[in-house]
Amino acid sequence: MAKNPKILSIVLAGGEGTRLMPLTRDRAKPAVPFGGVFRLIDFPLSNLVNSGYMQTVVLTQYKSHSLDRHISTVWRFSPLLGNYVSPVPAQQRLGKHWYLGSADAIYQTINIIEDVQPDIVVIVGADHVYRMDFQQMVQQHIESGAEFTVAGIRQPISQSNQFGVIEVDPDHPNMIKSFQEKPQTTTGLPDDPNSILASMGNYVANTDALFAALSLDEKAEDTKHDMGGDIAPYFAARNEAGVYDFNSNEIPGATPTDHAYWRDVGTLKQFYDAHMDLISYVPEFNLYNTEWPIYTLSGNLPPAKFVHAGRDRLGHATDSIVSPGVIVSGGEVHHSVLSPNVRIHSWSQVVDSILFDGVVVNRRARVYKAILDKNVVLTENSTVGIDTEHDLARGFTVTPEGITVVPKGTVVDD
């Protein structure tokens, strides 16, 4: 392996995101807004850029128009240096079908990898919120002699059926003894029986070994063509799979609170909870770390504005993230995230909620513990999140935890 190996990054952005419906009704999961001004895709791409990896392809599939547009608009690099972030839709190069799984997605674009001729391929998911220096993972991958390395993070054993579960070789702590994808039952870690080492869905692979594994998987009958379900176990069975402990990853500017923060936001509850992590005085995930920034398009929006300071009508926001272009005009916002161009009118109230771009909350309307998609309008005196039965009767989604989700463009008039 060369001292400075050539790296190609691949972002797997083809998932439907059905568990995030209705937020994914009109957009791909990686295009879902997050944290006020970002989209989920901005987090893995920012991590790759901050790691120094400037050649990236993003494999897209379902409802990818807004995702493709965002990547093409925001993630433009100078071609003079050979740098790029390139969205690649499903090519159907090997048959008239969509990607059959994450491994098949890479196999169907193997011509792109062959054109670049990298020594190592870094493969990451597109729908997690975290900071990570992939150079540190690549360095350990090279030093360990593994052909394929999986990033791991501790998670509660009760969630083992949601993750790939890694068993580490006790004699070689950087190598994987076995890998099970979403097992119904498993054993905990030796030092913590209530935890597992879960796959983060991030991989580093030697190119030749990856090609060989993908070629075998494509021909196999007993396969789901999945990186976690098929490719990782293949390398583990051959004693060629390494494991990288995410907890050892050091990020400039990280705080003790948000060190090794990682969240899967694949469900509405996880998506909501990850937003709530952003807005405390000492946030669990600090969006304001300028030493490892999360990049996106800033836009030409004016600053947020707060107006009306009367005794009975005070425009204010507390414990909240308020994006550019927002006007809080005599309303109250608490413990919430407001995306650009939101309007909060007099005597209205927004509490414990996430409002996407262009939402309008008119006078005396109330929003509690809700996610409002783009361009939702609450008319005067209307409510969301106050009466669960009423919300369900209007066709809104209400999670078991009581989070109400209103689809894009809805006018709430009662």
UniProtKB/Swiss-Prot annotation:
Query: What is the source species?
Result: Bifidobacterium adolescentis (strain ATCC 15703 / DSM 20083 / NCTC 11814 / E194a)
Q: Catalysed reaction(s)?
A: alpha-D-glucose 1-phosphate + ATP + H(+) = ADP-alpha-D-glucose + diphosphate
Family annotation (InterPro entries): ADP-Glc_PPase, ADP_Glu_pyroP_CS, GlgC_bac, GlmU/GlgC-like_hexapep, NTP_transferase_dom, Nucleotide-diphossugar_trans, Trimer_LpxA-like_sf
- Quote the gene name from the UniProt entry: glgC
The name this protein carries in UniProt is: Glucose-1-phosphate adenylyltransferase
Example GO biological process term? Answer: glycogen biosynthetic process
Residues recorded as binding alpha-D-glucose 1-phosphate, renumbered to this chain, are Y99, G164, E181, K182, S199
Q: What pathway, per the record?
A: Glycan biosynthesis; glycogen biosynthesis
Q: Does the keyword Oxidoreductase apply?
A: no
User: Recorded GO terms, molecular function?
Assistant: ATP binding; glucose-1-phosphate adenylyltransferase activity
Q: What is its EC number?
A: 2.7.7.27
Note the PANTHER family from the entry.
GLUCOSE-1-PHOSPHATE ADENYLYLTRANSFERASE, GLUCOSE-1-PHOSPHATE ADENYLYLTRANSFERASE-RELATED
Per the entry, what this protein does is: Involved in the biosynthesis of ADP-glucose, a building block required for the elongation reactions to produce glycogen. Catalyzes the reaction between ATP and alpha-D-glucose 1-phosphate (G1P) to produce pyrophosphate and ADP-Glc.
> Which Pfam families does the annotation name?
Hexapep_GlmU, NTP_transferase
- Which keywords annotate this record? ATP-binding, Carbohydrate metabolism, Glycogen biosynthesis, Glycogen metabolism, Nucleotide-binding, Nucleotidyltransferase, Transferase
Q: How does it assemble?
A: Homotetramer.
Source organism phylogeny: Bacteria, Bacillati, Actinomycetota, Actinomycetes, Bifidobacteriales
The UniProt entry's sequence similarity note says:
Belongs to the bacterial/plant glucose-1-phosphate adenylyltransferase family.
Where does the source fall among the domains of life? Bacteria
PROSITE patterns, alphabetically? Answer: ADP_GLC_PYROPHOSPH_1, ADP_GLC_PYROPHOSPH_2
